[in-house]
């Protein structure tokens, strides 16, 4: 990996030099736009809509349009702004881990200590881990000041840039203002179904099926040419059960629990042990008939 930024974590008088690396990368298959008729590459040009000319980068300005007025900002205007070039990851405060909302997470970066700062790096990492704390920081990346979270991941410190508060949209849905009551039986069935799918998250067991199928299609076309048999290459998947029909929630839960077996099958009888009201009398009568 190649470092994209070098600087130092600072809090109080402590200074921990680090290198910053992107923690993620895109593995999507790159596809180029072509002219279907002759295979020519599609080129996008910066063409002015008024005079029709192709405009070089040095002649391109930026503008803000509020719907009524347009303010043009030249490269010189933008260059006059106080660009943030600080090389510090400045710790603002230490907060409990659970206070961070994953919705605010943006990009992730690995931090590697400088050869002279390994002990200070390890001390900060251990202090955060033992205290179940996350460091809230500000950092200048690509000339923009970003809010970030310094977190522990294994034996590493990870910088997670955060969205600003006003970048998180508020959610208010009328459909959730009045929620129908949930019965004990519905909750029991839903819990049993959830338990049947319970497990430990292992991300390596999941794969991007679309990208895998796309690579398979590309390989088939390389080998067989344009006459590739798509049905033979991918097989024909069975139509999804149910055909999109709307069914009752209880019926859907019941069928799902019965189909899942395993944990749900063993948990389901327990959900039937304490039916309420009229259901209790019905259940008792059924048991009496069975014993007779």
UniProtKB/Swiss-Prot annotation:
Transcription as UniProt keyword: no
A Gene Ontology biological process term: double-strand break repair via nonhomologous end joining
Domain of life according to the entry: Bacteria
SUPFAM superfamilies: SPOC domain-like
Keywords annotated in UniProt: DNA damage, DNA recombination, DNA repair, DNA-binding
Low complexity composition bias: residue spans: 264-285
MF GO annotations: double-stranded DNA binding
InterPro entries named among the record's database cross-references: Ku70/Ku80_beta-barrel_dom, Prok_Ku, SPOC-like_C_dom_sf
Keyword DNA-binding tagged: yes
Domain Ku: 9-187
Region annotation Disordered: where it falls in the sequence: 264-292
Family statement: Belongs to the prokaryotic Ku family.
HAMAP family in alphabetical order: Prokaryotic_Ku
Quaternary structure annotation from Swiss-Prot or TrEMBL: Homodimer. Interacts with LigD.
Function: With LigD forms a non-homologous end joining (NHEJ) DNA repair enzyme, which repairs dsDNA breaks with reduced fidelity. Binds linear dsDNA with 5'- and 3'- overhangs but not closed circular dsDNA nor ssDNA. Recruits and stimulates the ligase activity of LigD.
NCBIfam families in UniProt: Ku_bact
PANTHER family, sorted: NON-HOMOLOGOUS END JOINING PROTEIN KU
Protein name as it appears in the record: Non-homologous end joining protein Ku
């Amino acid at each position: 990996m190649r470092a994209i930024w070098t600087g130092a974590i600072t809090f109080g008088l402590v200074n921990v030099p680090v290198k910053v690396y992107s923690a993620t990368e895109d593995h999507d298959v790159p596809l180029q736009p072509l002219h279907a008729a002759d295979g020519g590459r599609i080129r996008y040009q910066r063409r002015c809509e008024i005079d029709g000319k192709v405009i070089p980068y040095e002649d391109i300005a930026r503008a803000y349009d509020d719907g009524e007025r347009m303010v043009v900002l030249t490269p010189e205007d933008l260059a006059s702004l106080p660009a943030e070039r600080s090389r510090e990851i400045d710790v603002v405060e230490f907060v409990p881990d659970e206070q961070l909302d994953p919705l605010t997470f943006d990009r992730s970066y690995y931090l590697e200590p400088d050869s002279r700062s390994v002990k200070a790096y390890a001390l900060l990492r251990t202090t955060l881990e033992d205290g179940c704390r996350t460091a809230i920081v500000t950092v200048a990346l690509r000339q923009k000041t970003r809010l970030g979270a310094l977190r522990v991941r294994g034996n590493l410190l990870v910088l997670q840039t955060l969205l600003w508060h006003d970048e998180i949209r508020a959610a208010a849905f009328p459909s959730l203002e009045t929620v129908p009551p949930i019965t004990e039986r519905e909750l029991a069935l839903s819990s049993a179904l959830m338990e049947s799918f319970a497990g430990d998250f292992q991300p390596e067991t999941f794969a991007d099926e679309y990208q895998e199928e796309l690579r398979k299609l590309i390989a088939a076309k390389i080998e067989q040419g344009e006459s590739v048999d798509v049905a033979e290459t991918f097989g024909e998947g069975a139509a999804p059960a149910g055909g999109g029909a709307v069914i009752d929630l209880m019926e859907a839960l019941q069928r799902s629990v019965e189909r899942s077996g395993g944990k749900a099958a063993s948990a389901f009888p327990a959900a039937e042990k304490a039916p309420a009201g009229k259901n209790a009398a019905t259940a008792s009568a059924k048991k009496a008939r069975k014993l007779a």
